[in-house]
C-alpha cells in the first residue's frame, strides 16, 4: 500500500476516488433512509449522485482540498466539509435541472450537512493513512 500513495499524484487520485465513494454512499444511504432504495432505480440515484459529485469537484479544488501540502495537515481538515457545504446548492440546482423539478432548499442543506460530515470522517482516515505511510518511509 505504501508504494501506491507516496506521490502527490497518487494521493490526489486516492482522495478523489474516496470522495466519489463518499458522495455515492451518501446518496445510497439517503435513498435507503427514505425507504426508496429498492424502488428508486439506478437512473434516479444517478440523478442525485452525478450532480453532487460534479458540484464537489467544481468547488473543492478552490478550497485546496487536493493540494499535497494541505491534504496531510489536520489543521486543514475544515476544508472538505466547507467545500461540501458550498457545493450542495450547486448540486441541488444541477439535480433540479436534470430532473426538471424544483430545487428544494432543505434537501440542499441536509445533503450538504451529511456529505460534509461523511467527507470529514473520510478525510480524517485518509490523512492518517497518508501520514502513516509517509512516516514509514514515504
Annotate each PLM feature.
Residues 2-138:
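Signature of alpha-helical transmembrane segments in polytopic membrane proteins
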Amino acid at each position: 500500500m505504501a508504494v501506491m500513495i507516496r506521490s502527490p499524484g497518487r494521493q490526489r487520485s486516492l482522495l478523489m476516488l474516496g470522495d466519489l465513494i463518499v458522495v455515492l454512499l451518501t446518496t445510497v444511504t439517503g435513498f435507503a433512509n427514505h425507504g426508496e432504495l429498492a424502488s428508486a432505480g439506478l437512473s434516479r440515484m444517478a440523478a442525485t449522485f452525478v450532480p453532487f459529485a460534479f458540484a464537489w469537484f467544481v468547488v473543492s479544488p478552490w478550497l485546496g482540498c487536493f493540494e499535497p501540502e494541505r491534504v496531510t495537515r489536520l489543521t486543514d481538515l475544515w476544508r472538505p466539509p466547507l467545500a461540501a457545504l458550498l457545493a450542495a446548492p450547486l448540486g441541488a440546482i444541477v439535480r433540479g435541472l436534470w430532473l426538471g423539478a424544483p430545487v428544494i432548499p432543505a434537501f440542499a442543506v441536509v445533503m450538504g450537512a451529511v456529505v460534509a460530515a461523511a467527507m470529514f470522517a473520510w478525510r480524517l482516515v485518509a490523512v492518517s493513512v497518508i501520514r502513516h505511510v509517509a512516516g514509514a518511509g514515504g
